[in-house]
Amino acid sequence: FSLSNYSYTAIEGDTELEHFSIDFDKDDLIPMIKAAQEASEDGFKLFASPWTAAPWMKDNNSWVGGKLKPEHYSTWALFFSKYADAYKAEGIDIWGFTVENEPMGNGNNWESMVFSPEEMTLFVQKYLGPTLEAKGQEDLVILGFDQNRGDLKEWVDVMYKDKASSKYYDGTAIHWYESTYDYFPKELQYAHHKAPNKHLIQAEACVDSEVPAWKDDAW
């Protein structure tokens, strides 16, 4: 996890992302990824999950909560393309993305940006998918949802409603939270049968300390 808020698109109003930069990642994150690649005997695939757009793209001008302004949908789609290109230039191939980490929100404890199933599907169908296709990056995997399993049905019903809505989705991402008391087998089966030829991937799992009680822990 990052120790601070930062964006690759820090310049407000840079809708063409002419100043897009991953320099912040070059000291620690990229060397860590390369070290892991060198240590792995079998190799692994990398996918990325944005937690929020830069505040200037959002309706609440904040790192936390709020929604992507509709006028910045094209810019945000370009962001994914630029990110993949920038990492490739560093010798790291990105396999794919989730569209948004925890699009239903996270209690405003961390960076976040809210999408409804309909909003995310519109973004993927009309902006992200066509942008990657136009840039020759159609092999990049796009995973929708990316939150807890209990809400799968509502999301996959929208994502995989028809051929048009599902065209650019390569699968569904899920988190393990809440699964300590129920692993939601019916929801998992429903999502699988809704789109049996698409990925259903566990995208995040961590044991996070209670917020803000972690500040009382001995470090």
Predicted regions and their residues:
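General N-terminal targeting signals
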Residues: 63-65, 111, 159, 217
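Active-site neighborhood of glycoside hydrolase catalytic domains
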Residues: 74-96, 103-211
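Short, intrinsically disordered, charge-balanced linker/junction segments flanking boundaries
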Residues: 213-219
